[in-house]
């Protein structure tokens, strides 16, 4: 029982730190001091170190000799690489989902998330709706390895979406998301892929400008 409890504690610490990083509550480049986290969270250093190690595996945290663990920083090259990989995975998921998945279920789920996006009361709610909308294709693609590949980059992609949500006009890509819905309705995977690419490419300039202003 103690082992399960410990694992649960690590999960809780990991989830909290991850959420704080991807929502920018912990700024990029910030140092993660284990002793400070120990005092803040009221736990021993062991589960904190295990949680930080998991964040390192996601590359949300970087470890440097003589410095320790710190939150990642991003530049234009990083943004391009993350977007390229994420888009490749998203488009693969779309094509597989529309070939193997349940079209009616996909359309219903996407319309639900589109409605949540349109009625989001905060940028954070909008980010969650976009994340869930794209996640529909992974859930329906029928390829667990593709799903796991997405998870490996999910944290960094969510960080970029939260940065974009800090920018003016973050909600201005509703036509792209509507085009995703229409592509599913018309059984046109290439239209869906094009809409997702347009959404991602449209967000990049604002993200890069934000990074430049927060150097």
Regions from the language model: what does each represent?
Residues 1-99, 209-215:
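Short linear motifs at protein or domain termini
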């Amino acid at each position: 029982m103690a082992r399960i409890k410990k694992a649960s504690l690590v999960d809780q610490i990991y989830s909290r730190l991850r959420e704080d990083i991807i929502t920018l509550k912990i700024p990029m480049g910030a140092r993660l001091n284990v002793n400070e986290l120990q005092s803040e969270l009221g736990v021993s250093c062991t589960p904190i170190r295990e949680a930080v190690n998991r964040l390192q595996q996601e590359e949300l945290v970087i470890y440097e000799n003589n410095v320790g663990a710190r939150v990642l920083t991003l530049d234009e090259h990083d943004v391009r690489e993350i977007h390229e990989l994420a888009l490749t995975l998203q488009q693969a998921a779309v094509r597989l989902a529309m070939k193997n998945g349940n079209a009616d279920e996909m359309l219903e789920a996407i319309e639900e998330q589109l409605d949540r996006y349109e009625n989001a009361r905060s940028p954070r709610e909008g980010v969650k709706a976009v994340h869930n909308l794209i996640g529909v294709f992974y859930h329906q693609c029928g390829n667990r390895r593709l799903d796991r590949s997405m998870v490996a980059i999910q944290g960094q992609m969510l960080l970029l979406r939260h940065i974009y949500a800090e920018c003016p006009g973050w909600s201005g890509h509703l036509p792209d998301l509507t085009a995703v819905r229409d592509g599913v309705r018309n059984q046109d995977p290439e239209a869906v892929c094009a809409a997702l690419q347009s959404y991602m490419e449209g967000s990049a300039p604002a993200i890069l400008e934000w990074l430049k202003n927060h150097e």
